[in-house]
């Protein structure tokens, strides 16, 4: 069947159905609005309520680290899942209570995960309240000087 199709279309222009042509044309129109490498980042609408993350002052350090390990692996976007889970596997066990609180504030105090990604990759400047020792450590981790493959999350 495929051989017949190839033979029958050689030397002829392949005609797309009318519906496919209009869909293709509408997709071509959309490409003129962005340029390659441009970040499309819109502000949140003012009517969108962003809930405050609850502070847990009485949470034991080990429980907090376990929660952060889980939250670093389940971000909802693969890019941050890979970056944060490998970062936590490497550094979280050595964090003291203050560093753990800084990391908790970093991943739970931000309302948009793309912000964490852009700050960690130095695509956008990090705001002063998040420019901490932990963010600098994360930025170094993202640079991947050791050239470690990070195509999957580390085992638990």
UniProtKB/Swiss-Prot annotation:
GO terms for cellular component: mitochondrial matrix; mitochondrion. Residues 1-24 form a transit peptide. InterPro entries: SDH (IPR005631), SDH_sf (IPR036714), SDHAF2 (IPR028882). GO terms for biological process: mitochondrial electron transport, succinate to ubiquinone; mitochondrial respiratory chain complex II assembly; protein-FAD linkage; tricarboxylic acid cycle. Keywords: Chaperone, Mitochondrion, Transit peptide. It comes from the Eukaryota. Pfam families: Sdh5 (PF03937). Belongs to the SDHAF2 family. This is Succinate dehydrogenase assembly factor 2-B, mitochondrial.
């Amino acid at each position: 069947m495929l051989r017949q199709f190839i033979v029958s279309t050689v030397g002829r222009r392949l005609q797309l159905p009318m519906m496919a042509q209009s869909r293709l044309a509408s997709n071509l129109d959309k490409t003129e609005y962005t340029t390659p490498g441009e970040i499309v980042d819109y502000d949140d609408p003012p009517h969108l309520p962003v809930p405050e993350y609850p502070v847990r002052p009485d949470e034991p350090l080990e429980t907090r680290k376990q929660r952060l390990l889980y939250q670093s692996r389940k971000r909802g976007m693969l890019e941050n899942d890979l970056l944060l889970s490998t970062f936590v596997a490497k550094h979280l066990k050595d964090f003291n209570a203050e560093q753990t609180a800084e990391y908790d504030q970093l991943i739970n105090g931000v309302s948009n995960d793309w912000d964490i990604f852009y700050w960690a990759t130095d695509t956008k400047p990090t705001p002063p309240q998040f420019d901490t020792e932990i963010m600098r450590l994360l930025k170094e981790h993202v640079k991947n000087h050791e050239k470690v493959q990070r195509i999957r999350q580390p085992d638990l």
